Amino acid sequence: HSLSKTRYYLYFYDGRRSRIARNVIEVQDGGEENGVFSANMYAYLEDLSNYYQCKLLYHGTMRRGDTFVNFNFENQNNKVERAFLYAIHSFSNGGRMEGLCCCLSTQPILPACFKFLLSSEILEETEELKEKLKVSKEDIRLLKKMNMFVISDHV
C-alpha cells in the first residue's frame, strides 16, 4: 500500500531579494518511527504547484509534539549544510505555525536564522504577510533584552 503525504507551505521574507520566499515541505504520513516522520523540503520555488522545480532540495525528519513541531533537514547538494526549523504548534490560528529556521545562508555564506510561517494551505502573498515575516521592532527589543532571537507574537 502507498503512503500518503501531508503538504505544508513555508514562507519567509528574503531581504537579499526583497521578496517572500516560497517553499514546500512534504511529510510522509504513516511512516513514522518513534514519532519521527520522513520529510522533504523543496526550497525557493517560483511556482508552488510545480515544487519539483526547486532551487534546493532537503531530506530529513519531522517530530511533532503537543505545542511544537521541528524539522531537521540536510541539503542534498551540499551535505554540510543543514536546516533546523522549530515552530509553535497552535490550534487557534487556522492551520498556521510560526517559527524560526537556523541554517547556512548561501549568499553570503554565513550562519543564519529567520522567521517563517508554515501553513497547511497556500497563502496569498500580501503586504500584511510580508510585514509579518520581517524582523519587527518587538523582535529586536527581545533580541537585545534576552540576547537571543525568539518568536514574540503569534499569528
Task: Enumerate the language-model features and the residues they cover.
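Helix-turn-helix/homeodomain-like alpha-helical modules used for DNA recognition
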Residues: 1-49, 57
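C-terminal regulatory/effector modules of DNA-binding transcriptional regulators
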Residues: 51-155
